[in-house]
A protein has these predicted regions:
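Low-complexity, serine/threonine/proline/glycine-rich extracellular segments that form mucin-like
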Residues: 25-64
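Extracellular adhesion/glycan-binding regions together with long Ser/Thr-
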Residues: 76-93
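Sec/Tat signal peptide C-region and signal peptidase I cleavage site
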Residues: 14-18
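A surface/secretory-pathway sequence property marking extracellular, secreted
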Residues: 56-81, 130, 142-151
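Extracytoplasmic/periplasmic copper-protein system
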Residues: 121-155
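Sec-dependent N-terminal signal peptides
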Residues: 4-13
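Short, solvent-exposed loop/turn segments enriched in Ser/Thr/Gly
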Residues: 30-35, 96-97, 110-112
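Low-complexity, intrinsically disordered segments enriched in Ser/Thr together with acidic residues
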Residues: 89-109
Length: 155
């Protein structure tokens, strides 16, 4: 029985690493939040060479954390807000995090961050939203209402 639980835990841990995920499930509306996007593998055995995060409406003022060996590009053209890390190499056998800080709007709800993971000439879009059997789900952050009486301008 103990072996069964150990095996189940390993299978679940492997499944959890199969997508680009967020390090936190929820945050408070109206605050600044550090978000770490975890990349658990490359693309069919190839190293990850780029990651682009598209910010949803409700997340703004993004500031990426520098990452040694990677170039950062910020695109802010009206409705499109993206942060890209490119030029590095994250081998398929390893995981890493791509980190940014964002300002969350005062509105509670779910924010879906669309991701494009590049592995040389191959790319994977992690952009599926709300479904039971998604192959490439977008990371989601549940924005919770701010408690009454708590200032919302928190860094």
């Amino acid at each position: 029985m103990k072996k069964c639980f150990t095996l189940l835990a390993l299978v679940c841990a492997t499944a959890a690493q199969a997508h680009v995920t967020l390090d936190t499930a929820s945050a408070t509306a109206g605050t600044y939040q550090k978000l770490a996007f975890r990349v658990g593998h490359g693309c069919d055995g190839k190293a990850t060479t780029g990651l682009t995060v598209t910010l949803p409406e409700g997340a703004s003022h993004a500031k990426p954390m520098p990452k040694a060996g990677w170039n950062i590009a910020i695109t802010d053209s009206g409705a499109l807000h993206e942060i890209s890390w490119k030029g590095g190499a994250l081998p398929d056998a390893y995981f890493d995090e791509f980190v940014m800080q964002v300002k969350l709007s005062g509105e509670p709800g779910k924010l879906y961050f669309r991701i494009v993971q590049e592995c040389g000439k191959v790319s994977v879009a992690w952009d599926e939203i709300a479904g039971e059997k998604m192959k490439a789900p977008a990371p989601v952050l549940d924005v919770l209402p701010a408690p009454a009486g708590v200032p919302q301008h928190v860094h």
